[in-house]
Structures are given as structure tokens and as C-alpha cells.
Amino acid sequence: MVMLGQVVALAMASSAVALNCKNHNVLSNYNVANKDILLKNELDTPPSKTSEMWYLAPCEDGSRRQRPSECSSDDLMCAIRHVKVDGSDHLTQKLDVHKSAKYEVEEVESGGFDIRFLGVKWGSNTIDATLSYSCDTNLKTDELVTTIWNSEYVLIEMSGPSGCKRDGNSDSGDNGNGNGNGNDPDNNNNTGKDKKSKKTSWFTWLFVYAILFTVIYLMVVSYLNTKGGSFQDFRNEFVERGTEFITSLPTFVKEVVTKTLGTRDSSASRGGYSAV
């Protein structure tokens, strides 16, 4: 019974900690999936020089190509601090966040997201470690912005492509709403195009129907006038009436436009006055 309880507990732990970014409801929208990052920072701490190295591979299903030899293969995050003084190099601090760590993921309103590892053991201390990603489309690789490392918590702020939403979800491409309209969250651009397309389609069909009805009318009239005659008679009648219609069409259109504009001008000239 005790062994069964241990097996169940182990299964629950492993299912709770697997951070598969490609299938995560938040991280799958960002460029962090399948990436590992190696960041370095040097501080002038007289009389010594302090160098920090941060290895970040928060996605368990991601790459481990940049992992330094000091970090474990199952690390989701690894921090190493060296101090150089009097020509000698000393490893003073090391933090490992293994894939067994619990985590929280939260999107940031200003853009990007945070991954927070909870209850990480660091010697006798239990701390939280936060990876904060922000988007910068001008950068090709992620750059370190701020680091805080003390006995209570660790904070690493980065800026670069990992904090940007993927193509089809990015703010620059679809505002994160997945409709591919960039800075047009209400789909106004597509709406305008749809309206224009509908107007064009409506006019095209109106023109087609007008031509169709005209041809039918000419055929009916030509048939009635040549009823009992030969096909050649019908053809000659149809061609003659069609030619007359085409030649008279400009005059007809001009007359309609003149009458329409004349009516409007007449109405406008009497605007504001009433009959006495």
C-alpha cells in the first residue's frame, strides 16, 4: 500500500511539472518554444570582477544546444556566478532549477510573459525564480535587461524575440488575436475590403442582368416582326435592332443624366422658398 502511494505521488508530480511549451495554452503562442538561451553579465565589484552566466531552457521539449558544462541536462534554468580577484577565478554561487520544479505562467499586459518557478531549493533556502520575457522585434537574439539574485528570490528580465508572439499571433502581425490583421483588432481593414468587394460584385451582376434582359428583349421583338419568315430574316432584324439600340444608347444616357441633373438643379434653386 505504501509503495502504491509512492507510485501515485510520483505520477502526479511528473504530470504536474512537465512544461511542454508547444502544447501550453500561453507559451505555444510565443517564440520561446524550442529555444534555449545563454546570457552573460559582468559586474565591476572592486576589488573583484563578478561574472554571471544564465542558462535558460524553460521548455522541457526545447533545445539544449547552448547548455554549458556546469549545468545539468535536466535543468530548466541554471545560474552560475564567478568572482575574479587577484588573478584567480572562484565559483561562488550556483543555482539549478530542475524540471521537477513547480511553475506558473502569466502573460503581461504590456506584452510578453513571466515564467515563475516556485519553491526552488538553494542550499538551506527555498526561493522563487522568475523569468520575465518582453518583446523587442528589433533584436535578433534575447538580451539581458535586469538580474536580481538574493536569498529570497531570483528575477531575470530579458528583451528580444522570445517574448514576441509567433507569426499569426504576433502583435505586429495579428495583435495576438489570431485574425492576421496587425493593428486592426476590430477587423476594420477586412471589413472595408469586404464592403468594396460586395459593391463591385453587386454592380457587376446588375450590368450582366441588364445586358441579358436587353438581348432577350431584342430577340423577342425581332422574332415577332419576322414571324413566319426565315432565320436569315430574323438575323437581319436582330442585327438591325441591336445596332439601333447601341447607337442610340449614348443619347439615351445623356438624356437621362440631363433630366436628372436638371431636376436636382431646379429643386436646389427653389430651396428655402415656398409658394405664395
Curated annotation (Swiss-Prot):
Subcellular location as annotated: Cytoplasmic vesicle membrane; Golgi apparatus membrane; Mitochondrion membrane; Preautophagosomal structure membrane
Protein transport keyword on record: yes
A GO term from the CC aspect: clathrin-coated vesicle
The keyword Iron-sulfur is assigned to this record: no
Topology, Cytoplasmic side: 222-276
GO biological process, one term: cytoplasm to vacuole targeting by the Cvt pathway
MF (Gene Ontology): phosphatidylinositol-3-phosphate binding
Membrane side Lumenal: residue ranges: 19-200
Signal peptide: 1-18
Skewed-composition ranges (Low complexity): 182-191
Keywords: Autophagy, Cytoplasmic vesicle, Disulfide bond, Glycoprotein, Golgi apparatus, Membrane, Mitochondrion, Protein transport, Signal, Transmembrane, Transmembrane helix, Transport
Region (Disordered): 162-196
Glycosylation sites: 189
Stretches assigned to the MRH domain: 19-166
Spans through the membrane: 201-221
Main location: membrane
Disulfide bond sites: 21-59, 71-78, 135-164
UniProt topology in membrane: Single-pass type I membrane protein; Single-pass membrane protein
Functional note: Effector of VPS34 phosphatidylinositol 3-phosphate kinase signaling. Regulates the cytoplasm to vacuole transport (Cvt) vesicle formation. Plays a role in ATG protein retrieval from the pre-autophagosomal structure (PAS) and is especially required for autophagy-dependent cycling of ATG9.
Family indicated by similarity: Belongs to the ATG27 family.
Protein name stated in the entry: Autophagy-related protein 27
Annotated organism of origin: Candida glabrata (strain ATCC 2001 / BCRC 20586 / JCM 3761 / NBRC 0622 / NRRL Y-65 / CBS 138) (Yeast)
Annotated gene: ATG27
